[in-house]
Amino acid sequence: LKHSGVGLYNNRTKYIWDFATQFWAKPTDFYLTTKKYHVKKRDSIVEKIIGLGMAKVSFALEMIHPNVARVLCGDVHQLRLYGMEHLTYNKSKQGATKYKRMEQHWSVNCGKLKVPSYIARCVYWDALQEKEDSRYWSYVLEG
């Protein structure tokens, strides 16, 4: 971590260690096991893992369950789309409420269109990048 240049490597080392310890002690605490309550599960994971907020945990759940995850990675681009680019939501109850309202709005509208939330977010991101598909970045996930 120190040589990666990500910064805060002392904290990150501790956070990764704590996450690994908790995960391997009870992996099911981190699984989406039902078709609903994804936001509740995400929030419980956020409470367990120091150093990760709603957007990062949502991103992981989106990547693991791209067709069914009912959470939204509210990154800067998503926040900007909703006119909330300065929203602080990880340490603010009011901010978290606004984040969840945005997330619900996005999920409901994706559901109406019968497009998985994550897929719609990827299409939006590709459009921002002026790309027709995700191959410009997704190649890094291939073996």
Where are these regions (language model features)?
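Residue-level detector of well-ordered alpha-helical segments, enriched
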Residues: 11-15, 56, 119-120
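A basic, often C-terminal nucleic-acid-binding module that engages the phosphate backbone, implemented
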Residues: 21, 92-143
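Hydrophobic (often cysteine-bearing) scaffold residues that line and stabilize catalytic clefts
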Residues: 12, 74, 98, 102
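Catalytic DNA-binding helix-loop module of base-excision-repair DNA glycosylases/AP lyases
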Residues: 32-92, 121-128
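Hydrophobic alpha-helix position signal
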Residues: 1, 79-82, 110
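Alpha-helical ds-nucleic-acid-binding substructure associated with the helix-hairpin-helix region
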Residues: 1-51
